[in-house]
Amino acid sequence: MQRREFLRLLALAAAAGASLRPGASEAEAAEELYELPAFGNVSLLHITDTHAQLLPVYFREPDVNIGIAAAAGQPPHLVGEALLKHFGIAPGGTQAHAFTFLDFEAAARRYGKVGGFAHLASLVKRVRASRPHALLLDGGDSWQGSATSLWTQGADMIGAQKLLGVEVMTAHWEFTYGAQRVQQAVGKELAPIEFIAQNVKTVDFEDPVFKPYTLKNVNGVPLAIIGQAFPYTPIAHPRYMMSEWSFGIQDKHLQQLVDEVRAKGAKLVVLLSHNGMDVDLKLATRVRGIDVILGGHTHDGVPAPTVVGNAGGQTLVANAGSNGKFLGVLDLEVKTGGVAGYRYRLLPVFANLLPADPEMARYIDGVRAPHRAKLEEKLAVTEGLLYRRGNFNGTFDQLILDALMTVKGAEIAFSPGFRWGTSLLPGDAVTRDHLMDQTAITYPYTTLNEFTGEQIKAILEDVCDNLFNPDPYLQQGGDMVRVGGMTYACDPRQKIGARISDMRLGGKPVAANRTYKVAGWAPVAEGASGEPIWSIVETYLRAHRTLAPRRLDLPRVIGMQGNPGLA
């Protein structure tokens, strides 16, 4: 779609009442979305979880993001109409499309793709024009998620971050390139970007591996930015990749650092976090003296921060989505006594609304040029919508499950509940580029094992507890393992061991003592091997060429009627 046609459709949408924001007049169209008057004396720009998406993409937000216990009905566990109502967003317009799955296919065709570093660069420059001292912070998961990032070990994204003007970052998936590669990148390639993580220490003497924080002065305001890497990296990923490092939330150490930077004169303390939003919300109640948490990991695009009270006052907790789809803009008025006021906008990056920054576009073209033929090779065409996000399954994950069962001859298949991965509309070609968007990891091996029904239930219970444990500190983010070929029931309200029931294969109960052939991928054990997942799926795609709409293997969810995290 050409930009002129997009603007025409946008104007028509506004005329029909689908305003860019509540109360917008009919005459306002494209420019209104990014009108952002400056406020205060400190501005923070925030991106997170871009997952190496250099080009604009389609990305469908989840229709299932269940919150339980205290998180039920609270951000970020709101989807669809419940999210719109909570944040006062008018249905049917650009904001509704950006933040929800509602009418996704039609809205995606109307408004076009989102993100892309060339378009993001234009938006960053536009916002910085009225905020010349704004700091751009990257919450991590930037070096992983695409073919070129995997093939260059993140070097393509380091170049893009530097060109974008990122000043500070923390990390998660970056560590899956291995400790040696991360140290090489931080020590030799990343400058002038500062890499900070207070919760990564050596296993032997608990020495800090990276700088825990950085001190800045913006418009005469001394401030500190503390880094919080993903606390469960060695659990969620192969331990051998960072065997000499320990992680964890380490909120007591964090409190010591907050006190330390306050003693050094910081009037504003920011935590650049990759905890996940639920963990950040709990942490904000336990650690005093943090003014702002700019969070990531769980990919929650939340239109407004949550204000959390604690012994030291209040903490703003914000989360800025994923895949380069959003730019968070936080303007603060900081006085001698602390934060006196703030304004926050989570700006969707619509590629049709923002011109591509020429310098960034040239850089991206240079990154892709050596691989272009391989990346753009068409493997199949999809007749249905392909997407990943959702607590239990997505159609692209179903495609991966179907491929695993077919190619490896399995009765049941498991696929990790990753939250990264882009979307494709009906009629789109599935290229190798798109396939790698779903599978580009450093431990892509596929497996075929024999598990008993008892073992299968234990696996599902373990992952389900990670997702639905009522204590956020015992959640690791991500979604439920995707299950192909087998149905089951899930009651998120129960404790571990009692959430999974009624497992069936071909309509018959799964027997606890019988063995079943189970295919999977992404094993975390050292020494694992097997054909990479992208080869398995490519074999399946080439055999089919035209992909019928996927029928999702979904559990029967118990006890969640009326939960606003379930559409």
Name each model-derived stretch.
Residues 81-82, 95-99, 333-430, 439, ...:
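A short C-terminal boundary segment appended to hydrolase-like catalytic domains
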Residues 3-11, 17-352, 359, 391-403, ...:
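Acidic, metal/ion-coordinating pockets
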